[in-house]
């Protein structure tokens, strides 16, 4: 049997030649159109089914120049004649269409004279568009089609030929071309979007709709193009189709397109999607079994939250619960990465801007979710956004109580000095829709606003009806707090208008808007908490006070006046007095603001912004506020109760705080002296520290108390040595050491090393009862010329021999004293002191102790020497150490370091240290 003869259309060259010839013929050429279209149809069919679908067939077709005649053919066909009437719309096959030649009312009926040409044009267009769409799946073909002007003919076909199959292939070709940014811009410029939107509303075929939806999705490749699509009405038909999508494939295409169009959601996009009834279907699709559809629907809802106008409707449709549930799932143990949580976090925070959504969010467990975000160090970039969202609950008493119970206050305090999150700025359109921009001053107030204003006035947050405008919202106009006196006593005018607040930037709230930086939301919430009748449990704690003080002292410029008012409000509230005492808050205020030492600066100092004079004035003002509270009848009772009936920790804290906040002698004497507060504090020094800065606080407290006991005390000079060290007295022992001693020694003391030291028997016996009994009594040494001195080194014996022969201030006492920085325990100085006591030479002991003090406890000396001196165990030296530590004018840091050294040196034997410090504080040291 003979092999089948190959057809001419099997040759790509033949097909391209026929295509080129057809593209070069104008409408109404010399040949029979029917014959031409039939032959051309066979060529196009062969190109589509054999040549294009072959391996690398598209590239060969492009390389052989097939795209140019193909585009020319489309251009010729698009201009071949009038578009088929709307009655010919549909995807019915030609046989069905031609069967309707009999007259009748059927919509598809046409005369035979007008049917054949459009049908042939349709077949040509179908095949040519199919080939072009297939070719445009490759980047090189897309670029060439754009270069040869192939976009405009497609737009013309889309406009003129209203047949579903042709619209389908045209939209598919445009969608493929739109994958290139340059082609996408050209398609927009050619005006294709309105025709795609028109086809979207008129078409009924699912495949055609999917192609149009895909084309619109690919055309939304940039913010400008997405906005253009929304402004030309592309979103509403998509939303309307979503509610009636006949099959899952179309639903998937619609959701993907809406996801792309809603990125950076514009007002027009949100309006159209809402008006098209798309919110309800999107909420329903959030539980779709197919993951891609489900996640896309959730992200569309998250994108829509950027527009305030649609958020209330979104909440009514159930979007709040959907977004919270998805965010909770993604943050769970098997959740996804932080990047996938970001749009949901942003959406949930934006939902907090409307009251109706805040209520839904609170009831759905959103507060716990937001608190979890704040407590997560890995979510630190979102913390500023979350805090700003919580401002929406500013006047929701129930929500605030719940947030406080969940630990919001310390998180807010930490937020004041945290790292700035990388959050984009929200546009005006994201503002709360509770107060829309369209509101005018002449618009009558709604009942809800009147109720809000009446509540604010009744609760004391507004003094009168004019204090709050209907256009107020936390995001755009932070409510200024009323100017208030920082002192509860009207007579103290200096405390009512402190210079500190004026210097640090306080301005009258009624005349100038308060600054609203990154710290603004946190401060606004803290201010709201501080206005509670008793805010001590939340705000007068170590973390909260540290956060506020770190912000005030660490701000590069003037701090927000609201932070200063919070501190003033807390110190003026009698309900906070006990909390300030228990938490060492008063001591912290003095250390941080007045002395300039923060917890981070102890014991190693760190560089910080310096505004010491302003911070000092602020600290003194706050302590004065606490003094007013402490010296009131309520404060006296509270302090007395703490000192007598409080826990051991509270009693110590009260004793430590009294010198800072009590100035009345009768009060502090009763608390510290009569009721044992001072001895309690001194005893606690050698116990485990209840606060990281306890020893610093204690040293400062003892110094303040010393100033209260002796108000006119001046720096105490160190006792002078009997003889000036700079000009020592003549040495009386030196003549005995020369080659011709005069007078001649009548005995020698022999040391363990064999060294013999000359001495006078009479002088030695007269200087010490020990040597009087040894050398003049009935001991054998009284008859010996070589008297052994056991257990004595030459360096320790040297000051003893000098002292026995009358030397006072000759410098011999300095010999065994090591220089500062070297240990005294086990040194020659300790041995010399022991020898002076052993030989009953109290004057020598005093001289040696004074020498130790002169060298190791000089005013220029370091605090590390204080503990070394105390370790010698000498009462006079212990008093000297206490006096150096609490000396008026001493550097607070040195004082605290010295006290730390004393406590370490004392160990468990607290008695000597307690007595030494008590004597110095009370001014009764001998």
UniProtKB/Swiss-Prot annotation:
Residues 484-498 have a biased composition (Polar residues). SUPFAM superfamilies: ARM repeat (SSF48371), POZ domain (SSF54695). Ubiquitinated by a BCR (BTB-CUL3-RBX1) E3 ubiquitin ligase complex, leading to its degradation. Deubiquitinated by USP7. One of its GO terms (cellular component) is cytosol. Residues 82-113, 467-498 are annotated as: Disordered. GO terms for molecular function: ubiquitin-like ligase-substrate adaptor activity. ARM repeats lie at residues 139-179, 181-221, 223-263, 267-306, 307-354, 355-399, 401-440. Keywords: Chromosome, Cytoplasm, Nucleus, Phosphoprotein, Repeat, Ubl conjugation, Ubl conjugation pathway. Pfam families: ARM_ARMC5 (PF24768), BTB (PF00651). Residues 745-813 form the BTB domain. Coiled coil: none annotated. InterPro entries: ARM-like, ARM-type_fold, ARM_ARMC5, Armadillo, BTB/POZ_dom, SKP1/BTB/POZ_sf. The modification Phosphoserine is found at residue 337. SMART domains: ARM (SM00185). Substrate-recognition component of the BCR(ARMC5) E3 ubiquitin ligase complex, at least composed of CUL3, ARMC5 and RBX1. Substrate-recognition component of a BCR (BTB-CUL3-RBX1) E3 ubiquitin ligase complex that terminates RNA polymerase II (Pol II) transcription in the promoter-proximal region of genes. The BCR(ARMC5) complex provides a quality checkpoint during transcription elongation by driving premature transcription termination of transcripts that are unfavorably configured for transcriptional elongation: the BCR(ARMC5) complex acts by mediating ubiquitination of Pol II subunit POLR2A phosphorylated at 'Ser-5' of the C-terminal domain (CTD), leading to POLR2A degradation. This is Armadillo repeat-containing protein 5.
